[in-house]
Amino acid sequence: MFEGVLPALITPFTKDDTIDRTGLIKNIEFAENGKVTGVVVCGTTGESATLSTAEHMEVIDIAVECANVPVVAGTGSNNTAEAVELTKHAEEAGASGALVISPYYNKPNKAGLISHFRTIAEAVEIPIVLYNVPSRTGQDISLEVITELAKIDNIVGIKEASGNLDKASQIIENTMDEDFKVTSGDDGLTLPIMSIGGCGVISVVANIVPDRMSRLVNAFNEGDTATAQQLHYEIAPLIRALFTETNPVPIKRAMNLVGLNAGHLRPPLAPISAENNKLLANCLKELGCLQ
């Protein structure tokens, strides 16, 4: 379920600033046509920080209802009780698993982190994937904590987005005795992480080129490293352009440019700069996504 390519879907909004149900369904269909293995909703790319609890649940419900691939629901919070509530809802809605970010801002110690994730895992039966993205949370989940959490039956993997390939390697090394998967949280590190035993990527760029990212991962898994490398370098400029500003600012703009369903950003996020918009458009043209 957590192997292969899972796009971290954006959350499209209507002009009235409500969830664009039709747009979300179309985006899921577009991803599925690109042969992704699953989809992730309500993550960083999905602007979960500015979704109300009701909206969060609504997005999960829509995705589970319409998707033909496994749905992984972002259910993290810096409030343990809220994370439990969201994860329980994901399970009841029929999500295949939950992606749980480390508590942001609070910065709990080792005992607090372990207790937080254990409490969430014990409240449900669906698989849990940890989400480590210190650039957004302000705290890097330590190798010691990850190794301990990997022993919990339904904590089955981690989205590793620290950008530290050596740390990803150590996580894989330390959890070899557990059925624990490491997936890349950085599009540009997908191929390097897979080369050391990672299982795929939870991807931003797959919102717009799901087929290319799926082909990259499949080529590597089939032993065709030359094709995987070719695809890596083919989409690398777009990946860099998607992170010239805070995610999901560039990816939403890119999707709107090529006619996909993204809608606006919720404040305090603001539209992309003219300079970065030009760079993004040029990258899309180079890939044939934009005329």
From Swiss-Prot:
Question: Where is pyruvate annotated to bind?
Answer: T45, I202
An example GO CC term for this entry is: cytoplasm
Top-level taxon of origin: Archaea
What gene makes this protein? dapA
Assigned protein family? Belongs to the DapA family.
Instruction: Read off the Pfam families from this record.
Output: DHDPS
Picking any one GO molecular function of the record gives: 4-hydroxy-tetrahydrodipicolinate synthase activity
In the UniProt entry, which residues are flagged as the active site? Y131, K159
Q: Where is this site: Part of a proton relay during catalysis?
A: T44, Y105
Please explain the role this protein plays, according to its UniProt record: Catalyzes the condensation of (S)-aspartate-beta-semialdehyde [(S)-ASA] and pyruvate to 4-hydroxy-tetrahydrodipicolinate (HTPA).
Q: Which GO terms describe its biological process?
A: diaminopimelate biosynthetic process; lysine biosynthetic process via diaminopimelate
Catalysed reaction(s) here are: L-aspartate 4-semialdehyde + pyruvate = (2S,4S)-4-hydroxy-2,3,4,5-tetrahydrodipicolinate + H2O + H(+)
Q: Which UniProt keywords are given for this protein, alphabetically ordered?
A: Amino-acid biosynthesis, Cytoplasm, Diaminopimelate biosynthesis, Lyase, Lysine biosynthesis, Schiff base
Q: Which InterPro entries match?
A: Aldolase_TIM, DapA, DapA-like, Schiff_base-form_aldolases_AS, Schiff_base-form_aldolases_CS
Species lineage, top-down?
Archaea, Methanobacteriati, Methanobacteriota, Stenosarchaea group, Methanomicrobia
In which pathway is this protein known to take part? Amino-acid biosynthesis; L-lysine biosynthesis via DAP pathway; (S)-tetrahydrodipicolinate from L-aspartate: step 3/4
> What name does this protein carry?
4-hydroxy-tetrahydrodipicolinate synthase
What compartments host this protein?
A: Cytoplasm
SMART domains with a match to the protein in the record = DHDPS
List the EC numbers from the record. 4.3.3.7
Binding partners and assembly: Homotetramer; dimer of dimers.
